[in-house]
Amino acid sequence: MTHESRTYTTARAFCGHHAQPGVTQVPGALDWSQQETTPDQACIEAVLETVLLPGAAILHVGVGNSQFAHRFAARASRIDGLTLHPNEQTHAATLALPQYTVYLLNKYSPAFRAVLPHRYGWIIDTNPAHFACCHHHFWRMWANYLGVLTPQGQIVTCQRGMNASQADCGWTMTYGDLLRLEERFPVQVAPLTDGVYGIQPRDTAPVRRRRVAA
């Protein structure tokens, strides 16, 4: 069943719960442990294949089937993952990949930085607003990410993922919506390829910006 997509403009400012962000109640929306890798995830993985250096520390937000970790574990010093469903955490543990840890943690939560003890050169999130309950927790998520990102690190997302939202939460995003980050945080946003975008701390070497329809 289709639903009317929300945008940042039409989403609510605050859900009313500071400490506990809302979570979708749509059946099956949270457990992707036995599903195939999504097209948006595949697009990001294709980019990482060309730029990921040995020894990278990666945070993968929304681990799904953990095939991302399986693919990149050999060249990473650490891959930490986040999930909202215990089945994904259990599935990840069965793979017994070295330096791979999955946390049951909401990316919009104020507990984010207390739970994650490391810093990362790469943070992968196919759709930052997919499960967002409100503007307040959406902006908290970005503060969470920047709090664990290294000074030369990069957050990577994908337009195909940003085009989706849940029936009861989240909203779609455009490249123009991502550019709003530059007004709130010391970051720069730029396309890495058509449809895959990178967000970096502003004081790093500038990324050449390609023209993208907002």
What are these regions (language model features)?
Residues 3-51:
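Class I SAM-dependent methyltransferase Rossmann-like catalytic core
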Residues 167-214:
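Class I S-adenosyl-L-methionine
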Residues 152-161:
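Conserved beta-strand signature within the Rossmann-like core of class I S-adenosyl-L-methionine
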Residues 125-128:
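A short beta-strand submotif of the Rossmann-like class I SAM-dependent methyltransferase core
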Residues 131-145:
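A short, conserved alpha-helix within the catalytic core of class I
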Residues 65-109:
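Class I SAM-dependent methyltransferase SAM/SAH-binding core
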Residues 55-64:
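Conserved class I S-adenosyl-L-methionine
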Residues 112-123:
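A short acidic, Gly/Pro-enriched loop at the edge of an enzyme's catalytic core
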